């Protein structure tokens, strides 16, 4: 009897529910099923067949709404060109699932978890569904701890929270990509962690450039792909909104495996979080929802919250997320960036002025913020040093107009000292990157938080007033700066 039941079960699994397309509106389609065979919300549906010219079509879509009358409305994950009414649709019976684990490292995937780098198939023995619940409240790690990056300006003035969310603001050409690659490199070396990069609705050229630069800087190891430190998931600008709306979840799912199963610290990069919202708004009207403020989807906060709540620290491991934020028309009150800000623990703002001076990383020390910079979290010493650095730089900024008009000589003795120290601080905030060794020629430096604090304390106290300011430019810790000063002195003699 049991054998008969098993056979019956197997035949039911093999016999998937089938429906037919009744309407296609751009990336959205309506599909009718037989009574009692309706798919669940978020189920993955596939359309396989031939178009009018005889070419093979394979489109995956995701159920978004149950319309009644045995109809569902679904969003396509790839172009709907060539689809026709009456085509057969198969319900896979489960949400979209993607490969996870070590096999993903060094590879590029699309939203469906298919490799798109022409390096052959990926082992799909372990897959996770992209729609998963956020960790339970009891599993969360409530300790506030700093995530050390080894980058002086970040660790001192706008420290990242382990398992926190960081917004990365900056225009074109100020060094976002290099900063991202350095963070990927440092987490692998210092924390033994891995990274997942989600390219959401950005330029395909940038995605390709990032891949090439990662291979050049050995973040992706071509000789031994399994030794790579990052997995890449791309859903670029040319993809339909369905893919751009879900590619962030695909990347997050891959990151969750490393956190929950491998118990590692993971860095998740999302470039760009605004495009995730934008894709949702493109689909929203087609799904028949009333637009809300500025034409955005009424479900904006829910969609953002569902994604962001899954990015967190548990007692097992952490996902620290760095999200590039595009601000439409530089309007910070726009609903998309405003909703994003509610979730961020820190902001890293890149400045074009610093990049123009040749100070890299071009992180603006006065505009970048962090909720972690509190004396009871980072300690009194770190807090006092950071405040001292900010005060000195702020005073220097105020004095710049006077210097431009009257010159340095017109300043008081005290102000001249502040300017000299501020210029040293500004230069000491720069540092050579491992991933930039190829084009700078100077070896990269990872500076521990203790060394960073010690260095800035010495500059603020006036111990190093006698050293030339160029000794502080592009060095690691303060010992290196004093050694460089000695070399400069010898050369000048």
Curated annotation (Swiss-Prot):
Major localisation: plastid
UniProt GO molecular function: ATP binding; ATP hydrolysis activity; proton-transporting ATP synthase activity, rotational mechanism
Its membrane topology: Peripheral membrane protein
Binding site for ATP: 170-177
Stored SUPFAM superfamilies: C-terminal domain of alpha and beta subunits of F1 ATP synthase, N-terminal domain of alpha and beta subunits of F1 ATP synthase, P-loop containing nucleoside triphosphate hydrolases
Record InterPro entries: AAA+_ATPase, ATP-synt_VA_C, ATP_synth_F1_bsu, ATPase_a/bsu_AS, ATPase_alpha/beta_chains, ATPase_F1/V1/A1_a/bsu_N, ATPase_F1/V1/A1_a/bsu_N_sf, ATPase_F1/V1/A1_a/bsu_nucl-bd
Catalytic reactions on record: ATP + H2O + 4 H(+)(in) = ADP + phosphate + 5 H(+)(out)
GO BP, one annotated term: proton motive force-driven mitochondrial ATP synthesis
Gene3D superfamilies from the UniProt entry: 2.40.10.170, Bovine Mitochondrial F1-atpase, Atp Synthase Beta Chain, Chain D, domain 3, P-loop containing nucleotide triphosphate hydrolases
GO cellular component: chloroplast thylakoid membrane; mitochondrion; proton-transporting ATP synthase complex
Places the protein is found: Plastid, Chloroplast thylakoid membrane
Key words, A-Z: ATP synthesis, ATP-binding, CF(1), Chloroplast, Hydrogen ion transport, Ion transport, Membrane, Nucleotide-binding, Plastid, Thylakoid, Translocase, Transport
Family classification: Belongs to the ATPase alpha/beta chains family.
PANTHER family to which the protein is assigned, alphabetical: ATP SYNTHASE (PTHR15184), ATP SYNTHASE SUBUNIT BETA, MITOCHONDRIAL (PTHR15184:SF71)
Family annotation (NCBIfam families): atpD
Function recorded in the entry: Produces ATP from ADP in the presence of a proton gradient across the membrane. The catalytic sites are hosted primarily by the beta subunits.
Subunit architecture: F-type ATPases have 2 components, CF(1) - the catalytic core - and CF(0) - the membrane proton channel. CF(1) has five subunits: alpha(3), beta(3), gamma(1), delta(1), epsilon(1). CF(0) has four main subunits: a(1), b(1), b'(1) and c(9-12).
Name of the protein in question: ATP synthase subunit beta, chloroplastic
Organism whose genome encodes this protein: Chara vulgaris (Common stonewort)
């Amino acid at each position: 009897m049991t054998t008969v039941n098993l056979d019956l079960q197997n035949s039911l699994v093999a016999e998937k529910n089938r429906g037919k397309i009744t309407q296609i509106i751009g990336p959205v389609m309506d599909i009718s099923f037989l009574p009692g065979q309706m798919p669940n919300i978020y189920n993955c549906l596939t359309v396989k067949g031939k178009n009018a010219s005889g070419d093979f079509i394979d489109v995956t879509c995701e159920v978004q709404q149950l319309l009644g009358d045995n109809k569902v409305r679904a969003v396509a994950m790839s172009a709907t060109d060539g689809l026709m009414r009456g085509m057969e649709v198969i319900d896979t019976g489960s949400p979209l699932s993607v490969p996870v684990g070590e096999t993903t490292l060094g590879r590029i995937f699309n939203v469906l978890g298919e490799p798109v780098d022409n390096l052959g198939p990926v082992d799909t023995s372990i897959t996770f569904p992209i729609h998963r619940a956020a960790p339970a409240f009891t599993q969360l790690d409530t300790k506030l701890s700093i995530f050390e990056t080894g980058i002086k300006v970040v660790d001192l003035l706008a420290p990242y929270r382990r398992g926190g969310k960081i917004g990365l603001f900056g225009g074109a050409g100020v060094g976002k990509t290099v900063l991202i690659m350095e963070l990927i490199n440092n987490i692998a070396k210092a924390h033994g962690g891995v990274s997942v990069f989600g390219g959401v609705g950005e330029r395909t050229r940038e995605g390709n450039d990032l891949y090439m630069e990662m291979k050049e800087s050995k973040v992706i190891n071509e000789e031994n792909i399994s030794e790579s430190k990052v997995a890449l998931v791309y859903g670029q600008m040319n993809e339909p909104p369905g893919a751009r709306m879900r590619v962030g979840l695909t990347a997050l799912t891959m990151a969750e495996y490393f956190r929950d199963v491998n118990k590692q610290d993971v860095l998740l990069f999302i470039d760009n979080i605004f495009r995730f919202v934008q894709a949702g708004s493109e689909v929203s009207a087609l799904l028949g929802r009333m637009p809300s403020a500025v034409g955005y989807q009424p479900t904006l906060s829910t969609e953002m919250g569902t994604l962001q709540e899954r990015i967190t620290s548990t007692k097992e491991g952490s996902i620290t997320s760095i999200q590039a934020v595009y601000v439409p028309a530089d309007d910070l009150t726009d609903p998309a960036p405003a909703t994003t800000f509610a979730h961020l623990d820190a902001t890293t703002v890149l400045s074009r002025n610093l990049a123009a001076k040749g100070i890299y990383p071009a992180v603006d020390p006065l505009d970048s913020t962090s909720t972690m910079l509190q004396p009871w979290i980072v300690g009194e010493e770190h807090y006092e040093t950071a405040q001292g650095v900010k005060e000195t730089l702020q005073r220097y900024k105020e004095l710049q107009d006077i210097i431009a008009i009257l010159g340095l000589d017109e300043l008081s003795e005290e102000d001249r000292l502040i300017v000299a120290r501020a210029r040293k601080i500004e230069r000491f905030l720069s540092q050579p990157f491992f991933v930039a060794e190829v084009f700078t020629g100077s070896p990269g430096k990872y500076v521990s938080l203790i060394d960073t604090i010690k260095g800035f304390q010495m500059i603020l106290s006036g111990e190093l007033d006698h050293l030339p300011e160029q000794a502080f430019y592009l060095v690691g810790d303060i010992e290196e700066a004093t050694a460089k000063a000695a070399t400069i002195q010898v050369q000048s003699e």
